[in-house]
């Protein structure tokens, strides 16, 4: 049990996919202007990452490995991701139409978000078992949601600040993301797995 907790904390803080591995930067910059869509996108991505991790593990170990078709893992994972994202989109559309409208094009774009495919491939590379894969996916989603909400709150404050003209817009966003990345590097060495 402690192993799973350490893996979760490590994935959220120490090895954050956005700020340390630089995966998922498109939605990180695109959906982080306001906190509400950031929370919705974070929850949707966490849901997708957790389910994708579970299904990618099952496809890899119970379909591809027995058929000696490991070379098709990337293609198989893309199909798994597409199905999970479509399912997530239907659930959000039925249960939270306002969130569905706010997320707009970013919801189906989770399919092409490199964090989702990267996580599935990293699970296989790191040889995680089923529970480790699910925890790694959940932790990756929580880490993504954490930095997305933090970044959105900072961008809301920056929108009200007196930022010099050359730094307005995306420039101050990149500087802020860089400073956040440096702050998260402070967690390095916190957990040794």
UniProtKB/Swiss-Prot annotation:
This protein's record includes keyword Nucleotide-binding: no
Keywords of the record: Cell inner membrane, Cell membrane, Electron transport, Membrane, Translocase, Transmembrane, Transmembrane helix, Transport
Membrane topology designation: Multi-pass membrane protein
Stretches that traverse the bilayer: 5-25, 39-59, 72-92, 102-122, 134-154, 170-190
Protein EC: 7.-.-.-
GO CC terms, sorted: plasma membrane
Gene Ontology biological process: electron transport chain
UniProt xrefs under InterPro entries: Ion_transpt_RnfA/RsxA, NqrDE/RnfAE, NqrDE/RnfAE_oxidrdctase
Coiled coil (UniProt feature): none
Top-level taxon of the source organism: Bacteria
Localization annotation: Cell inner membrane
Family assignment from sequence similarity: Belongs to the NqrDE/RnfAE family.
Purpose of the protein: Part of a membrane-bound complex that couples electron transfer with translocation of ions across the membrane.
NCBIfam families: PRK05151.1, rnfA
Subunit structure: The complex is composed of six subunits: RnfA, RnfB, RnfC, RnfD, RnfE and RnfG.
Name of this chain's protein: Ion-translocating oxidoreductase complex subunit A
Organism: Tolumonas auensis (strain DSM 9187 / NBRC 110442 / TA 4)
Lineage, uppermost ranks: Bacteria, Pseudomonadati, Pseudomonadota, Gammaproteobacteria, Aeromonadales
Gene name of this polypeptide: rnfA
């Amino acid at each position: 049990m402690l192993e799973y907790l350490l893996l979760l904390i490590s994935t959220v803080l120490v090895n954050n996919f956005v700020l340390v591995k630089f995966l998922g930067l498109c939605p990180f910059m695109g959906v982080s202007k306001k906190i509400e869509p950031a929370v919705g996108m974070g929850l949707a991505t966490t849901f997708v990452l957790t389910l994708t991790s579970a299904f990618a593990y099952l496809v890899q170990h119970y379909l591809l490995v027995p058929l000696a078709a490991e070379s098709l893992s990337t293609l198989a994972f893309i199909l798994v991701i597409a199905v999970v994202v479509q399912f997530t989109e239907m659930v959000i559309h039925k249960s939270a139409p306002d969130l569905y409208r706010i997320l707009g094009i970013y919801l189906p774009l989770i399919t092409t978000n490199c964090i989702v495919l990267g996580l599935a491939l990293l699970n296989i590379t790191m040889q995680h078992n089923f529970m480790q894969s699910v925890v790694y996916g959940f932790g990756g989603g929580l880490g993504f949601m954490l930095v997305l909400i933090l970044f959105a709150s900072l961008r809301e404050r920056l929108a009200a600040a007196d930022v010099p003209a050359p730094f307005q817009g995306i420039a101050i966003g990149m500087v802020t993301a860089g400073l956040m990345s440096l702050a998260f590097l402070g967690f390095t060495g916190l957990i040794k797995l």
